[in-house]
Amino acid sequence: LQYLLLFLLAVTLTAQHAPRSKPVTQAEVDRITREAILIDTHDDVTSRTVDGYDIAKPNTRGQTDLPRMKGFLGAEFFAVYVDASYVKDNHSANRALQMIDTVRTDIVAAHPNDFVLATTADDIIHAHEQHKIAALMGIEGGHAIEDSLRLLRDYYALGVRYMTLTHFNTNNWADAQGDATDPKVLHHGGLTPFGKDVVREMNRLGMMVDISHTADAT
């Protein structure tokens, strides 16, 4: 206890005599955010643009619109979100392709002065130099590949650069945390052999493996 009291006293005295940092001005904040490349790694606004929402208009129901993105945002990973309901009747790939198309068509092509499609780090830097927002894509939910490495490669060719192995639902090759305690769900104890093939292929392609939502075993 004696040593603890001495330690606390030393910390207190040090804090009292530490030089005060000068307040940061708004101009400094603007300079840093203008020079740095700020990257948002997940944005679900695509679930609205796919239904006709124009990202250039103020968004009163969400947090993303072009006027706010112009506040020094450098790059945006738009979510290729595929709800688990699309697994039924094998509609996951159809939905994924629609979500990819809304990024390429409704966002990038519709606003060429503000966005540029990016698939590499160099693309992001080049977009920053042009004072444009780099638009990237990440799939949310590995069921989007419909158990096909060919589809995975197709998504990569279309510009997808990361994929969450699962969303809230366990798929045919990876366990999710969202239904980990559901006795009605068939779990695999992590990744199946095919699931490991998916990860290996993602590594080979250069697609980031996102483990958000996955079970610990996965």
Per-region residue spans from a language model:
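Bacterial N-terminal signal peptides
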Residues: Q2-T12
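Short, intrinsically disordered, charge-balanced linker/junction segments flanking boundaries
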Residues: T14-A15, L66, T214-T218
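N-terminal hydrophobic targeting/anchoring segments and the immediately downstream early-domain regions
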Residues: Q16-L186
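Histidine/acidic residue-rich metal-binding segments in metalloenzymes
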Residues: D147-A157, D179-T218
